[in-house]
Amino acid sequence: MADRILTTHAGSLPRPLALTGLYARSAQGGEVNEAELSAAGRDALFHIIKQQAENGVDIANNGEQQREAFFLYLRHRLSGLGGRWTRPPRAELISHPDFAEMMKEQASLRPVVSNMEPPKAIGAISHVKPEACEQECADFDEALRIEGYEFDHTFLTAPSPGIVCAAMKNEFYDSEEAYLADLAKALRVEYEII
């Protein structure tokens, strides 16, 4: 039995402002130098490993530094996603319009990647870039090795088929069940690599 409670977090940690700016520009369809984005993501990864170690995190991860957002990165790895749609506002934003306005004001002060207008399913879903997940894992392993920090455990995140199905509207499949089944097959690639 452990003599203390191990500390961890949900996975996504704040990204540097410059990196967020690159992700925001890319998410809005702007031109982004891929080499610059990749280098900024790797730099942020190394920094976030150090931050977790220095702040006593026992179970660490890559902070999702090399992804623009928790599930939006899948548009670069899965076929069949495209276009945009506007997700309905969350219940707390409907119940508290003053809070919604404050969130909107804060978002206008800095670059942000919004998950409120994600892509939708417009074709058959399959995983087409396993090498991107493999590279993310390799970068994390390299950062841990080079930085030399020892954590009790480490992990990487991947979204569930359910959150992707709920967030990325189906405009292709005959049923949500069929959409969910193909998402599960595609995301299994990520799970097995991780």
Label each residue range with its predicted role.
Residues M1-I193:
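Domain-level signal for soluble alpha/beta catalytic cores
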